[in-house]
Each structure stands twice: as C-alpha cells, then as structure tokens.
Amino acid sequence: MADKITSRQQDYSQWYIDLVRSAKLADYSDVRGCMVIRPNGYAIWEKMQAALDGMFKETGHVNAYFPMFIPESFIAKEAEHIEGFAPECAVVTHGGGEELAEKLYVRPTSETIIWSSYKKWIQSYRDLPLLINQWANVVRWEMRTRLFLRTTEFLWQEGHTAHADPEEAQEEVIRMINVYRTFAEEYMAMPVIVGKKSESEKFAGADATYCIEAMMQDGKALQAGTSHNLGQNFAKAFDCQFQTKEGVLDYVWATSWGVSTRLIGALIMAHSDDKGLVLPPKLASRQVVIIPILKGDKEEVRAHARFIAKALNKHGISTFVDDSENNSPGWKFAEYELQGIPVRIELGPRDIAEGKCIVARRDTFEKTEVLLDAEMTENIEEILNNIQQNLYERALQFRQDNTVEATTWEEFKAGVEKGFVIAHWDGTDETEALIKEETKATIRVMPTDEEYRKQYNMDEPGTCIRSGNPATQKVVFAKAY
Amino acid sequence: MADKITSRQQDYSQWYIDLVRSAKLADYSDVRGCMVIRPNGYAIWEKMQAALDGMFKETGHVNAYFPMFIPESFIAKEAEHIEGFAPECAVVTHGGGEELAEKLYVRPTSETIIWSSYKKWIQSYRDLPLLINQWANVVRWEMRTRLFLRTTEFLWQEGHTAHADPEEAQEEVIRMINVYRTFAEEYMAMPVIVGKKSESEKFAGADATYCIEAMMQDGKALQAGTSHNLGQNFAKAFDCQFQTKEGVLDYVWATSWGVSTRLIGALIMAHSDDKGLVLPPKLASRQVVIIPILKGDKEEVRAHARFIAKALNKHGISTFVDDSENNSPGWKFAEYELQGIPVRIELGPRDIAEGKCIVARRDTFEKTEVLLDAEMTENIEEILNNIQQNLYERALQFRQDNTVEATTWEEFKAGVEKGFVIAHWDGTDETEALIKEETKATIRVMPTDEEYRKQYNMDEPGTCIRSGNPATQKVVFAKAY
C-alpha cells in the first residue's frame, strides 16, 4: 500500500520521488547513480518500446546490436564528440584479470563504434541508405541524479542511418523527430514542441539537432527526444567513403536519433497527481481493474467479475480482477489509483441485480454507471479513448496557460519561474549564456512547426529580450530537467 | 551475394564462420572479443525474444532492469560465485574523470546486484514469490571467441526468482528448464536432452544446475539453456530473510535461469547447410520470398506476385517480393537460400497462365507446383509447418545416429570423436576430470527425462567406463562448444 505521497504543491520534487517509490516504478540501487527499474516501471517501458519499434519498422528501419565497449581511440576520432562525452564516461581498464592495452569506454552513445562498422559495410551507393536502430543501455556519469530523468545508466534506443546525399539525411532527421512527436502526442498524450536546438544545446558532433520539448506540471521543460543531422562528420572521422551513382568518391551522410527511459519520467511528470500515477490507456499494461464488492453470494459476484474481465480481454482491453479478501475495497481503490490503472470497475451484488456496474476514471475520478449489456465492452473502450484524449487536452491547456510572451526582462524573469517564455533572441551564444546565468533558463527549442510559429508570431522581428539588439525571431525559453 | 562458403565436410569451423559472415548475421567488431549482431542476425534474436518473453509471462513472470555495474564487494559476498566469475570480468576503475573508490564489475550475471535489491523488497512470505526476468547484455572476458557461441559481450535473459520454501523453488527450476525445452524443440526445431549438470559443471553459487543440451552437426554438444537451484546461498550472502507464515525468520530460496544469443549459434549449427542458413519457419522474420520471373508482360507478373504476397501476409505468413531487375532469378535463388528464407515461390508468365506457381523448400530443396487458388495460403502454411516438423525430425534422427552406448574405453574414445556417448560413470570428480583430460569430452548432462532414460537404460547399474569402479547410472558424454 501507498506510503504517503507529498503533494505537488508542497514540494514537487519530493512528490515525484515519493510517487516513483510508492508506485514501485523504480528504486535507487547500491551503485552510485544507477537505478533499478522495477516491474511496474519496466512494463511502461515495454509498452513504449513496442509502439516505437513498430513505428521504426514502418519507416523502414531494422534493429541490430553493437558492442557497448568503445576503444578510447574511437571516441577521440570526432573532435567535438570526445570533448562532449569523454568527461562523463565510465572507463574499463582491466579485463580477464589483466590491465588492458587500450582503455575501453562504456558507450555514452554509439556513433563511433557504429561508424567503425559502417565503414566496412558501405562501399557504394547501392549499400545506402543504411537504416539501423539499436535498443541498448548507455552510461553517462552523472553527479546529480534523479530516477528516470537523469541516471548514470539508462536504457534507450539509438537510430543510426547512413545516406548518399544531404537532402535524404535531412529528410530522415525530420521524419524521425516527427515519429517521436507522434509517439509523444498519441501514446504518451503529451503535447510537444518540435524544433531545432541552438548551437550551444546541440549534440556533440552534430551539424544540427532537432528535438521535442514537453512541459511538466511544474512548468519546467523536458527534452523528450532528439534527432541529429550529423552531416559528414562521423564519416570523415572514420574515413567512410562510398562510390556515388556518378562514380566519384564521397563521404557518407549521417543521422542519429534517440529516446530513453527518461520518457517514463516525462510521462509521470506530465499527468500524475497527488494520489499517484496517471497513465494514458495506450501505455498501460493493465487498463482496467475490476474490484468485486464481496457481499452476499461472493462466488456469484466473483463469477460475474471474471466474466466481464474475460469479455473485455477478448475485446483487447487488458483487464484483471482483484478479488482477494485480505484487503478492503477502499484499500484497493487507493492502491490502483496509485498504480495508475486508467479505469476501475466496482461490482457488487446490488449492481449485478440491477444489471450495471460503477466505472471510475483515474484521470478525473468521475464515476458513471455502465450497463452490463452487449455494448459494455464498447462503452469501456470509449471511456479509455476519452481518458487518452482528455489527458492530452489537459496537458495542452496547461502548457498554453503557462506559456507567456515576454516583451520586458521583468516579464521574462517572472515567466521562466512559472513555465515557458516566448521571447526575441538576438541569435548570439553570449546572450544565451547570459540569460542562463541570470535566470537558469535556456533556449529549449526554436520551433519548426508552422502552427506553433503562427500561434506565437515567432517570425516577427523585434529586439532581443536581454541584449536589446535586433532579433529576427522569437524562441522558447524555460528552465529544464 | 554470397562469398563462397567452405563446405561442412571440408572444415566445419570455417563453414560456420563463412556462413555467419556471408549471411550477414554477425561480424567481429574492432573491440577484442565483441561482436556486432547485424540486422539479419538480430531479427532471429527478436523472434526468439518474442516467443520466450511470451512463455515467461504465461508462467507468471514480469520483466525489470537492474544496473549493469556491480560493486566489487557484492561479487565477493558469495564465495563460489566470486571464484567462478571474478577472473573473467571487465572492471571499471574510472568514472566521470575520476578514479572510483570502489571498482565496478560489468555484470557477468546479476545474482548479486539483484539480491541486494531483493533484500529490500522482501520482508514477509506475502512478498513471495518474486518472479522477475531481465533482458540484458553481460560481459565475460573470453580468450578464444566464436561469433554467437562465445563472445566477451553477449545478450541474454536472466530470470531471478525468490521463494518461501525449497519445494517451490525446485518446481520453478524444473518449470523453467521445461520452458526452454519447449522453446528449443517447438521453435528452434532442435531436440534437446533435459537433465542435471555434474558438480564440476554446475553454476558457481548453485546447489544444482539443470540444462538442455543439443547436438550440433559435427556431433559436438552445445549447452542451450540452464536453470539453477540456488538454495539459500544468495539470500545468506545478502542477509535476505523473511517472516514465514508461521512467524519465524528464514532465508529466502532462490532460482535463476537464462538463455543467450548463443542460441543463434546453436540454431545455425543445428540446421544450416553448405548453401547457407536454414531457419525454422517459426523463427524466420521473413518466411516466404516470391521471385517473379520477369518475362513477357512484366507488370502483370509483378501484380500477381504482389497479390499473392498480400494474401499470404494477411494470412499471417510473412512474405516479400523481390522484383528487382538488377539481379537474375538465379542470383536471387542463391541469395535467399543463403539467408535461410524457408520457402521460395517462383512465378513466371507461363505459371500464371496455367494458374500455378513453383514452391521450393529451403530444407530439402524439393520443388512442388501449387495452384493459385483459394487454398493456396493454406497450402503454403502446410508446407511451412512441414518444414518446421522436418527440421526437428532430421535433427533428432541425426542425434540418434550419432549417439553410441559405450561399454569399452575404445568405444568411448571413438564415440566422442563422432557424437554423444552414453556410458557408466562412477560419480567421482576425479574420473570426470581424467576423462576430460584424456578425451576432451565432458559430462554434458545427467538426463532427467524419463523417456530418454529408458531409451538408453540409464538407470542400469554397471562399471565405470574409465575407472572400472561400480557405477549406479549412465550419463551423457561429449565434446562441447
């Protein structure tokens, strides 16, 4: 049963920790900065993996697996890459009881080890494109960790593609950030802003980084996925050339893109409440719990509960019955609210006599009566669809309510304490750094979505919110996880 | 297209390497002893994972994820365990640019890190059983590596369960080795012998190890899966006690069980031939290739091919069309034989006119005519089922043909050069070690399957094949991968 969860209002950070622990989603391990993803948390990851993997395959990608150890000399081949990643790597110096001739880095990301293979596999334009994804664990040494959001080891997928020309690579970059957007919005019920990162925020080794950014319930931003245009940087670092259709040699064009178990943290922070986890039905491994009220003819109540569960499962709605007598219905209500089961069905002898049951929604706590008739499965399905839709709309409304367009520095400073701020920026690293120093807010994204750009007149020229210099566009600022 | 594959007869080891490379299943990487699992190989692993994961869940298990780093002090807690595993570990000594206070071992297996969590999660019999599985990468430093069969890093699943009494733990051990048997026989079409390992071959830290052993086409044995009864060893090492139903404290009973990407090597060695990979249809991500013979009205032939592919896919048979004009039909035949596509359909204008197509089986190369009628999908399905069945029976026949019951030392020595030898053993470590030293053969398994025991009169007392001392039972000897 739930330990007491601190309320969001009282202490948002503590609420998050309490929730993750109480709902048994994850635990810190005895290894510094590493987490244990417990079965309840891992079940969410499995649903995410299944949906994403299907979308990757539909867009022509195949899975493969590359070594997790990267020789030090490989990491060093791409200058920006080593500068960005080497300081946060775990380093293997001994193996099989002996000191290694060359140190091995545990992959923080796999561009280098993968391009050392691509070099062998790609000779001609006929070998392109190469569209490969990998599901793997990666390690980035973190000083300050937070379950799911920032841990030394985490799970992710990383796509690595190779193309014959820059246009095709750029198409891939955009295709995949849009796949992430679709996943975030349609599965996670989490609205995101699609766009580009500023130079200072882009991936170490990329020409350009695209991202999806979401707003959490405390108004902070969370980067939920990235897609990088790597240009010819890694092909040059690994001397990966191919013969073009025209018969000349050129370096291969590359992309990479990834999302991680961080998405579980985003999911929690986007929707959950003071009673526990709130899961969008599409990512709930268990969508409906039936709690029989065991009075009168208990076996008859149980039989009805099982019958309904069977019908719902047959209809593709993942349902289970908790008919244990160790715990009271009230205890069970609280427990499954904590676990984020989207729909609870209460069923007692009187309900059965009246041919109905009580259906409680996790998102709104609204209770309705549903008839135990031939349309029941469809009615429950509709409720699940409504929950999915409502979570998205609620989160979108929240984001809109907590986004301000700042025209003064005072508005800006107040705005980033509360949510996203849309403001003019002069385009310089210096101003960006200054704003970060003074407010802890960073440029989260330079939106590329037309609708979003129009909504906030992002293309309107103006003066920079901090420097007062001319600015050609507005960008989105926020504090971030 | 295929590089030339060495024939099995000429050089079995080279045949294996050639096949793995030519069919693009895996590649050595630039990291010592580590492999790249290429998309064709990984697709097999994905099919294996899906089938096994389903079977684990049906038997009540859930997935979770534990850190891959294990503090040195944890490994040291179970005496036999550290002795067995420490010498083959990769060791992280630096992280985030600094030397670590305590070295971290990259997991060679996860008993220790998992039991350090179980200790926190288990207080009472109500918390038991705990039935958790993990899909992960592990590292065991190997001096002599072979793609899939023995590499420094490999992928696997490891189940770790906790129970309130030894009977339930033993039931779990047997349940899971039987799950592996079912998987090996029904999906991999690979007959296996189920049984116990001798003391010297059991897992470091286990009271007993059960295994499934398969025969490869060179007569060698391959251990394809293990299930360990860990007794209270790890619970004691991690001081994991629970309150029993009777209200007293006791140590928790444990099991662990695993299979790895080694199964892909087993699959190759069990069925494949000099033309390339032979895949059982249940593990083929692509089961049927349609090769249109592009003569006459090419577009009409193509349209028919696509129509058939659509019908087969709709029926749940994974089918694709190769209608490229860059390569000849003959080239395609060889290429898809190399890749192990179970069924090839050839379809030319004359076939279409006659309302039929040619269906070629990968396992027997047999060609039959199949009518392009309403029963076609079912006929193809039947052929796929026949292939699955035939591969199993062929492998079983091969195993029987290459198993000898030895009653003299000469017979024994000749037998282990060819396959499995069933012989009396006096039950001592000394004799076992002597036999290994003299013949390189080891005790692969002490069968527990009644049918197998009867077939070879394993319970018949006799005299030890090597020492001449009294022996209460026969066991299975072989050279092994």
UniProtKB/Swiss-Prot annotation, chains A, B:
Name the keywords, alphabetized. Answer: Aminoacyl-tRNA synthetase, ATP-binding, Cytoplasm, Ligase, Nucleotide-binding, Protein biosynthesis
Report the principal subcellular site. Answer: cytoplasm
Q: Which Pfam families match?
A: HGTP_anticodon, ProRS-C_1, tRNA-synt_2b
EC number(s): the record gives 6.1.1.15
Provide the protein's localization: Cytoplasm
What SMART domains has UniProt attached to this entry?
ProRS-C_1
Q: Which CDD domains match?
A: ProRS_anticodon_zinc, ProRS_core_arch_euk
What family does this chain come from, according to its entry? Belongs to the class-II aminoacyl-tRNA synthetase family. ProS type 3 subfamily.
What does its UniProt record remark on the domains? Consists of three domains: the N-terminal catalytic domain, the anticodon-binding domain and the C-terminal extension.
Could you identify this protein by its name?
Answer: Proline--tRNA ligase
The record lists the lineage as: Bacteria, Pseudomonadati, Chlorobiota, Chlorobiia, Chlorobiales
Per the record, the gene is proS
